[in-house]
């Protein structure tokens, strides 16, 4: 496409507007696509949108200038972003930024004269345990140093991931169960397996190179059809990444490089011997640990929600189905009524994991009782995780997106909702890709969309990307952003459960809350409520970053002390 051709640009915009049905709520998505194609928002494109969608040009400019992800001036071929969040700041992100500025000869917000590089900063990229972080065209590089900056920028090459496979379509709960039994032996055999962490944190340490090296090495030994190899979501122990776990003994190797892969395959996969030099060594006791669950970082955790992250390929819906995925949805559709679902969630004691800890069942009950003029209600997932040092939501969306999606569908059944949105930070490209892929797979499989599992229940979900405004994580600002308006909070004298998105009853929960729902429906309220304290049930996920020995993502029972988290799991404060 000739990007300087105004006619071609106008045609591109017209196609985008038509594809999005000229809906005001899709304005941000349209702007993102234009910027993806042209590296900025040309003035002509904004004028075309205003004409085609019959929106005042001032409103278009209002959205384009409010969100920091958008640019009205051309950007370079490669976008270099440096995290300046608290966790990266204490690890000298300022020095890294200065080095990039020296190397490129530009400052933040500027573009090199040859249009090769643009330099940007961001408050937090959610890979805090691997800081300081630099991102080039969406690829993360962690533990940056001046030497690494120069090496990466000199040799940078763009990488593209292969498109994931889909699944068959299920017309009933029985059909889903039949398929589950057929894929279990292939994806959950209990035999030899190799799990390579491919979450953002480990990707920053080049784990994708480790994964590819492992694939080639297994093939060279004729083991590619005998060993289950998975690129998984975040294992949590980000500071020691890239991580590789070899099953069924679950031997944990840390700081693995592509050069280590040959030894891991020859010694551990083939002969069952441990590669001592790659084991985790506790800095306090000097002890080395072979098995993942024995490592102090993991030993005191209770990974009810995060556990599957270490074994699932998030791009494969059959991995999720093989381990019980969407069984809770089938149960909610055919064995429970909406009131029963809400009652189960209430007896489990689930509270919101993203804000004030409001009882989830009470929230759902209010939204179910609320009247809608046309019967339309919404459920929303708030994944606009902007707090510095926080990356809990990112890891869940990247590593186990179907659990979040399944929770949302169950919530929609309980509330009587017809549409859902996942609002994700634009600074989380892997999370956006992961949840978008999960939605497409679920639709293809008959688990989302019209007549889910032949039940007659209809529900669809869309992804709405944030555009760099921290305030858009606030509930009413988030809804304004989805509607295509400037993401500013409104007065809260009217609850969003009564009058929310598009002035319809709306239920908003965060990523972690939704991920708890399938667990409750599958295992029952009593089992779930047996974890935690009398008033706070279940577990809570925390990002453990900054000046601490073991940084990463932890999941612990409610009621645990901060001292236990910092010292027993985190290994204490260095020095």
Stretch-by-stretch model annotation:
Residues 1-575:
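Feature of Fe-S/electron-transfer and energy-metabolism proteins
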């Amino acid at each position: 496409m000739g990007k300087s051709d105004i006619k071609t640009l106008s045609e591109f915009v017209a196609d985008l507007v038509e594809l999005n049905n000229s809906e005001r709520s899709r304005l941000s998505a349209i702007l993102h696509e234009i910027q993806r194609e042209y590296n900025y928002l040309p003035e002509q494109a904004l004028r075309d949108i205003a004409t085609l969608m019959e929106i005042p040009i001032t409103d278009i400019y209002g959205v384009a200038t409010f969100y920091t992800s958008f640019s009205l001036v051309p950007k370079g071929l490669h976008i270099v972003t440096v995290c300046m969040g608290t966790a990266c700041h204490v690890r000298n992100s300022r020095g890294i930024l200065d080095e990039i500025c020296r190397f490129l000869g530009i400052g933040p917000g500027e573009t090199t004269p040859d249009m090769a590089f643009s330099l940007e900063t961001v408050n937090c990229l959610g890979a805090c345990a691997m800081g300081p972080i630099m991102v080039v065209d969406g690829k993360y590089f962690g533990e940056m140093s001046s030497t690494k900056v120069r090496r990466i920028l000199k040799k940078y090459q763009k990488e593209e991931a292969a498109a994931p496979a889909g699944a068959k379509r299920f017309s009933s709960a029985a059909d889903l169960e039949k398929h589950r039994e057929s894929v279990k032996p292939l994806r959950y055999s209990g035999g030899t397996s190799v799990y390579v962490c491919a979450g953002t944190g480990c990707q920053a340490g080049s784990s994708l190179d480790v994964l590819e090296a492992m694939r080639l090495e297994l093939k060279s030994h004729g083991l590619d059809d005998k060993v289950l190899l998975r690129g998984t979501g975040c294992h949590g122990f980000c500071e020691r990444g890239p991580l590789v776990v070899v099953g069924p003994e679950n031997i944990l190797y840390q700081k693995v490089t592509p050069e280590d892969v040959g030894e891991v395959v020859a010694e551990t996969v083939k002969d069952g011997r441990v590669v001592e030099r790659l084991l985790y060594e506790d800095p306090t006791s000097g002890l080395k640990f072979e098995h993942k669950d024995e490592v102090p970082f993991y030993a005191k955790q209770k990974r009810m929600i995060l556990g599957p992250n270490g074994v699932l390929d998030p791009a494969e819906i059959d991995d999720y189905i093989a381990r019980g995925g969407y069984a809770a949805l089938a149960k909610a559709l055919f064995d429970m009524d909406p009131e029963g679902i809400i009652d189960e969630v209430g007896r489990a004691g689930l509270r919101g994991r993203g804000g004030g800890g409001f009882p989830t069942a009470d929230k759902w009950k209010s939204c179910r009782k609320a009247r809608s003029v046309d019967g339309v209600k919404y459920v929303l997932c708030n994944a606009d995780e902007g707090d510095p040092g926080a990356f809990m939501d990112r890891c869940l969306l990247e590593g186990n997106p179907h659990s979040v999606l399944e929770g949302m569908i169950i919530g929609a059944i309980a509330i009587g909702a017809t549409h859902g949105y996942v609002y994700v930070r634009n600074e989380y490209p892997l999370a956006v890709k992961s949840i978008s892929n999960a939605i497409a797979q679920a639709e293809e499989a008959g688990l989302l969309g019209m007549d889910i599992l032949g039940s007659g229940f209809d529900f669809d979900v869309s992804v709405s990307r944030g555009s760099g405004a921290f305030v858009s994580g606030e509930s009413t600002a988030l809804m304004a952003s989805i509607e295509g308006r400037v993401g500013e909070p409104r007065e809260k004298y009217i609850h969003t459960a009564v009058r929310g998105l598009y002035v319809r009853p709306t239920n908003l929960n965060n990523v972690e809350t939704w991920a708890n729902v399938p667990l409750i429906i599958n295992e029952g309220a009593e089992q779930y409520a047996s974890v935690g304290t009398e008033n706070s049930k279940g577990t809570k996920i925390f990002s453990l970053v900054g000046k601490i020995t073991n940084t990463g993502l932890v999941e612990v029972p409610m009621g645990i002390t901060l001292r236990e988290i910092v010292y027993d799991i985190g290994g204490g404060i260095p020095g």
